[in-house]
UniProtKB/Swiss-Prot annotation:
Gene this chain is encoded by: glnD
Sequence segments annotated as region (Uridylyltransferase): 1-379
A Gene Ontology biological process term: regulation of nitrogen utilization
CDD domains tied to this protein: ACT_ACR-UUR-like_2 (cd04899), ACT_UUR-like_1 (cd04900), HDc (cd00077), NT_GlnE_GlnD_like (cd05401)
EC id: 2.7.7.59, 3.1.4.-
Cofactor: Mg(2+)
Protein name: Bifunctional uridylyltransferase/uridylyl-removing enzyme
């Protein structure tokens, strides 16, 4: 960013200000240290400060650049301090022949050192000396500080020589962090460079894990103080979760570990993609803009975005009201989205550090020792003691004497609810070589490990400690292979090992009843499988353990489970169950999200795979944990509804409750049931309506929805409207249903999905029906955006209006798509190999076309349009998004209702779809589908 971009000359003209002070000094009769001269100098600097701040605020209001404003204010302060220090050393307290001891460097540290300030930010200064302070130096420091304080600035300061800086940085993490941000301002630059070199060599080198763990622990403590959630309605912009300090922490740890000076260097190192760097800069800019506006608006260092100032800040940032949402709500929504982005960046960077084994030295809460120094034995042999609520080793050789103690340490910590003493962990780390084949096969060690894994307390916490220490990967080498393994895509938020630990945490929460509202079925089922609960914990630990191998990780993982389970002490029957669960851990998610659950063949095929109710229960809970632990925002109510539907439908088959009535008999029953619900209609009108839908409609749509559709169509007919839409929010499922009644034509679904995309609707499912009088009744499900049904209904009605306008010709779809949809820029960093499969075995009635490719705006509209152009009728569409990747399934027939069985025609369909997806030469068309969870 150049000075021209910053327009620094509009903030303060350094030469003009310096010349003005020198002219005042040259013409003054008083001593430079006199009170009158001091007042003149002070007023000149205060005027420059006020003018510069006013200019910075004006520029912020015009260009909106938060980072620009922070840099401008920093430049203003740099200029004033430089000129003041020069005046102090050359005019107020000049030295004719300064000795080496009187050299001094003025250094910006802390937040000021990072090069960005809000109006009320603290100014942290280090007066750096070569040796001890001199009388002359004391005068300069005192003059400079008092002038800055009298200018109304909050100045934090220290006066130290280099040896003192190094010693204190070694002892105090806060001082170390402040020096990490050190930036030369004025004075002796060689002195500052010496500090930089010694800090790098004597402090940074070799202490990366210690620093990173301390910063992350500090962040966690700060979150607990400010509020765990980033969605606090009155967030602290500086200290809250997802706020500025989180961004600072990210840069601190990467700067410390990778020895970089700028965020841009992280791209070259592969830590951040260019899209992620842009996201980082965008979040930083927004948070700076909010914080700078808050300081300007309140005339103080206000960091809490409270209710009373939210309206003014929203106005300053230029937000305006939209239908159903006022300008403050739009601003706060933007704030929360940025806070979420900061959380995403935290995961990205922490995962990259884990991948580089930056955290191989475990860190734990270092609690100040209490007055009590009592120790008590924790084991019969006296190997472990409890010391101030931390488990420690009683002797330095206990791991060498009995390597099982390396597992027993964690077992006892879990049983007694203890943290870990650093001494114990250091000894453990030095003893990792003792974990060998003999220990891995030791029955007692495996018994203890299984009890840790299946603990009724908080197994994730202890397993995380085992992982951080290196014990888990050594004890289970297959787990060690996936520690810090990154999956380079936009779907998975965590390393594989982190994902597995989070899965176990979710299961523990379900078992403790903490998620009964969000996951009612899992909450109920967990109480019915007490005998098999251990199998779920083992499965969750192992289900992704084969990631990163050339073969399907589910199959390879099942093979690993078959080998490990007997070692853990599981019976042959239990081992068989875990092996099956690992092999099929993606199946339920895949079927629920990408298959038509109203198609009987889907349910029967899935029941054939599951075979027993016990397996069905275990697989449902496993799937919930797996999806929920992928990352924030991945789980939603719609996925929960799909899984519950699949569970209940399969339960009927497995328990013998599934109807074996013929299709015709079920159609007859459904029509009679609807006729009964419409008994208040005139018979002639009722009979005419019952003749409209085809059999497939009655066999797949619930009776309540059939009644709702009947009144919907009746009202449209009475009003003489050929084209009409209806919206219905589903809060628990987190989707909103939009029903469209329109004259049928081949590209209707393409137009509807395109209109949804243009209106900002994210489609997750679509059901298409035609009536005997040539109309289409299409039901589209879009992701929910608002908390309240009223807000969501208004939003859905706006989407419906766009659909009506496009279908009626009032709006031109291509123009709307061009205006309203933007590519996901982050997705450009990824490649998804296009895939098309055509399958005639998944449904008795329909051909299933499954496509996979890189997501882009309007893709669903393009796909459905092409399928229609290929003379195919779409009965249903099932849309699944995994970050940058989409997997869409379409249930189709030809125009006379038959499956697509001709090989030549299938080949043509594949080629056309692959071309649309961007494949070269009609590339890959077969292969196992990459599926939903983890």
């Amino acid at each position: 960013m150049s000075a021209h971009d910053l327009k620094l000359e509009e903030i303060v003209n350094a030469e003009t200000l310096r010349r003005k002070l020198n002219e005042l000094a040259d013409t003054a009769d008083e001593s430079y240290t006199s009170l009158p001269m001091r007042k003149v100098v002070l007023q000149t600097l205060k005027d420059a400060l006020a003018s510069g701040r006013a200019n910075a605020e004006d520029m912020l209001m015009k260009d909106g650049g938060g980072t620009l404003c922070a840099k401008r204010l920093c430049y203003l302060m740099d200029t004033l301090i430089d000129i003041l220090f020069e005046f102090a050393t050359t005019r107020t307290y000049p030295t004719r022949n300064p000795s080496k001891a009187e050299n001094m460097a003025l250094v910006a540290v802390g937040g000021y050192g990072r090069g960005g300030l809000a109006q009320g930010s603290d100014i942290d200064l280090l007066f750096l000396l070569p040796y001890k302070q001199t009388p002359w130096g004391e005068q300069v420091v005192e003059y400079t500080l008092y002038m800055l304080w009298d200018m109304g600035l909050k100045v934090g300061h220290s006066t130290r020589n280099i040896d003192e800086c190094i010693r204190l940085a070694r002892e105090d993490m806060t001082i170390r962090t402040a020096l990490l941000d050190a930036r030369f301002l004025t004075g002796d630059k060689d002195l500052f460079r010496t500090l930089e070199i010694r800090f790098e060599e004597e402090i940074v080198k070799g202490t990366e894990p210690e620093f990173i763990q301390a910063k992350l622990a500090e962040r966690d403590a700060r979150h607990r103080k400010a509020g765990e959630t980033r969605y606090l309605v009155e967030p602290n912009v500086k200290e809250g979760k997802g706020g500025q300090r989180d961004l600072h922490t990210l840069f601190w740890i990467t700067k410390y570990f990778y020895r970089v000076k700028t965020k841009e260097e992280l791209v070259k190192l592969g830590v951040l993609s260019r899209a992620e760097l842009k996201l980082f800069n965008k979040a930083e800019d927004f948070l700076w803009a909010v914080r700078c506006h808050m300081h300007f608006a309140t005339l103080k260092a206000e960091e809490r975005l409270s209710f009373d100032i939210q309206p003014e800040i929203a106005q300053r940032l230029g937000y305006t009201a939209h239908p159903g949402q006022n300008y403050v709500e739009r601003f706060m929504k933007h704030y929360f989205l940025v806070a979420k982005d900061v959380g995403d960046l935290t995961r990205i960077i922490c995962a990259a550090l884990e991948e580089q084994q930056a955290k191989h030295v475990p860190g734990f809460n270092r609690i100040f020792l209490t007055f009590s120094r009592r120790k008590r034995k924790l084991s019969d042999d006296g190997a472990f003691i409890s010391e101030n609520h931390r488990i420690n080793i009683a002797r330095p050789d206990i791991f060498r004497q009995d390597p099982v103690n390396m597992i027993r340490l964690f077992h006892l910590a879990d049983r007694h609810g203890l943290e870990f003493h650093p001494e114990a962990m250091q000894s453990l780390t030095r003893s990792l070589k003792l974990i060998n084949a003999d220990l891995r096969e030791n029955p007692e060690a495996n018994r203890l490990f299984l009890e840790i894994l299946t603990s009724p307390r908080n197994p994730e916490l202890i397993l995380r400690r085992m992982n951080e220490s290196g014990v888990l990967g050594k004890f289970i080498p297959d787990f060690g292979k996936i520690v810090a393994m990154m999956q380079f895509n936009m779907y998975h938020h965590y390393t594989v090992d982190e994902h597995l630990l989070r899965c176990i945490a979710v299961l523990s929460e379900i078992e403790h009843g903490e998620l009964k509202t969000e996951h009612p079925l899992s909450n109920h089922l967990i109480t019915t499988i007490k005998r098999d609960r251990n199998l779920l914990y083992v499965t969750l630990l192992l289900h992704d353990i084969a990631k990163g191998r050339p073969e399907d990780h589910s199959i390879a993982g099942a093979r690993i489970a078959r080998r490990l389970c007997p070692r853990f002490g599981l019976t042959p029957s239990e081992t068989e169950t875990v092996e099956w669960l690992v092999r099929e851990h993606l199946t339920m998610s895949m079927v629920a999200q990408s298959r038509d659950l109203n198609d009987r063949k889907t349910i029967i095929d899935f029941a054939d795979t599951v075979q027993t109710m016990e397996r069905l229960k275990l697989l449902l809970i496993l799937t919930v944990c797996d999806i929920k632990a992928v990352g924030p925002g991945i789980w939603n109510g719609w996925k929960g509804q799909l899984l519950r539907t699949l569970f209940y439908e399969t339960e009927l088959v497995l328990t013998g409750g599934f109807s074996e009535l013929s299709r015709a008999a079920r159609d007859k029953q459904a029509r009679e049931a609807l006729a009964e619900r419409l008994s208040d209609w005139p018979k002639e009108e009722r009979d005419a309506y019952l003749a409209l839908p085809y059999t497939n409609y009655f066999l797949t749509v619930s009776l309540d929805d059939q009644v709702r559709h009947a009144h919907f169509i009746r009202d449209a007919d009475q009003q003489g409207r050929a084209l009409v839409t209806m919206a219905k929010p589903h809060a628990f499922e987190a989707v909103t249903e939009i029903t469209v009644l329109a004259p049928d034509h081949p590209r209707l679904l393409s137009v509807i999905t395109g209109a949804c995309a243009a209106a900002g609707g994210n489609i997750v499912d679509a059901q298409i029906f035609t009536t005997s009088d040539g109309r289409a009744l299409d039901t589209i499900l879009i992701s929910r955006e608002f908390d309240t049904d009223d807000d969501e209904r208004r939003r859905a009605e706006r989407v419906g209006k766009v659909i009506e306008d496009v279908l009626s010709g009032k709006a031109h779809l291509p123009d709307m798509l061009a205006k309203r949809t933007k590519p996901k820029k982050a997705a450009r960093a990824f490649k998804v190999e296009p895939r098309v499969e055509i399958n005639n075995t998944l449904s008795n009635k329909f051909t299933v076309i499954e496509v996979e490719g890189l997501d882009r705006p309007g893709l669903l509209s393009e796909l459905t349009g092409l399928i229609s152009d290929l003379s195919l009728d779409i009965a249903s569409a099932h849309i699944t998004t995994f970050g940058e990747k989409v997997i869409d399934s379409f249930y189709v027939t030809d125009l006379v209702g038959h499956k697509i069985s001709n090989a030549t025609r299938q080949g043509n369909i594949k080629r056309k779809l692959l071309a649309l997806l961007g494949a070269e030469n009609g590339a890959r068309t077969n292969g196992r589908s990459p599926q939903a969870a983890a």
